[in-house]
Amino acid sequence: MAKKVVKTVKLQIPAGKANPAPPVGPALGQAQVNIPSFCSQFNETTKDQMGFVIPVIISVYEDRTFTFVTKTPPASDLLKKAAKIESGSANASQTKVATITHKQVEEIANLKLSDLNAYCVEKACKIIEGTARNMGILVKD
């Protein structure tokens, strides 16, 4: 018989930098999870993605054990890295802060395809282009 999930915790944690301080400690403490164990496992899993914020979904079982699934970094983080900017535009419709190529959008879409609500790369590209547009990033061919 499978273990019963009693709580699901969703967090966004910098890759390789999980520690018991907020937001990780309080969120997992409420679920009565072994926090140092989670931090070491998460840091080991994400050490090759340093510099990105990694979404993680933690399933806590009734015997206080846990499993977690890491997702791909948010599209906005990937777009900022591709455009070499610190943040998006405060007024995206009027001010464009950077330009990226369609090829860069396609690379990001391929990376994010498993987490997006799309079945093909073309549709995933449209989703990424929409995110870029909302950040004030212009997509050129």
From Swiss-Prot:
Pfam families: Ribosomal_L11 (PF00298), Ribosomal_L11_N (PF03946). Forms part of the ribosomal stalk which helps the ribosome interact with GTP-bound translation factors. PROSITE patterns: RIBOSOMAL_L11. The keyword Chaperone does not apply. HAMAP family: Ribosomal_uL11. The gene is rplK. One of its GO terms (cellular component) is cytosolic large ribosomal subunit. The keyword RNA-binding applies. Belongs to the universal ribosomal protein uL11 family. It comes from the Bacteria. This is Large ribosomal subunit protein uL11. Gene3D superfamilies: Ribosomal protein L11, C-terminal domain (1.10.10.250), Ribosomal protein L11/L12, N-terminal domain (3.30.1550.10). NCBIfam families: L11_bact (TIGR01632). GO terms for biological process: translation. GO terms for molecular function: large ribosomal subunit rRNA binding; structural constituent of ribosome. Keywords: Methylation, Ribonucleoprotein, Ribosomal protein, RNA-binding, rRNA-binding. InterPro entries: Ribosomal_uL11, Ribosomal_uL11_bac-typ, Ribosomal_uL11_C, Ribosomal_uL11_C_sf, Ribosomal_uL11_CS, Ribosomal_uL11_N, Ribosomal_uL11_N_sf. Part of the ribosomal stalk of the 50S ribosomal subunit. Interacts with L10 and the large rRNA to form the base of the stalk. L10 forms an elongated spine to which L12 dimers bind in a sequential fashion forming a multimeric L10(L12)X complex. One or more lysine residues are methylated.
